[in-house]
């Protein structure tokens, strides 16, 4: 297990440990989580992204709904613990179906399990990729004058996204944290929604003539594509 995954797991396990300690002390367990409202969204100048502010809401076992939320969170953390220990991964969809074996803790619909993963991201300050949760959709492709280093199952490899790829380009992996930008000669990045337009630009040598990095979004961009573009 990598160092960041160990830190992630340690942070995750603090949640059920806190619930247990509260119950041990005879208290009704609860957890705090950032409130998901427009009023609680702030722009982080350093990272240049929108983040949640300091406003908190409480998930408590005082209500039946709150008790179910804490129970499901404990089951999900147990599942993520096993997944990290075994170096396995799963999709959001798979997590929903796996919960069918959790008895009263199972999710009634996938949006419930999706929101819980989002809750864990907010509480722990780790991304779902660190939990080994991956999206269903494929990443987009990149063509252009940029050299990257990617961590693969067989070690690291360096790829130039013009010289070392075919017309299909370099496919963005699910976890873009495994990519390091080494150098580039690009003047700008252009994101293209449709495959036809992207292919036309490649055929006409647009990336070489204008030193452009062409990113094919494949319609609505996947999470990994959005994260890569932000970098």
Please give the residue ranges for each predicted region.
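Nucleic-acid enzyme cleavage-core boundary/entry regions
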Residues: 1-231
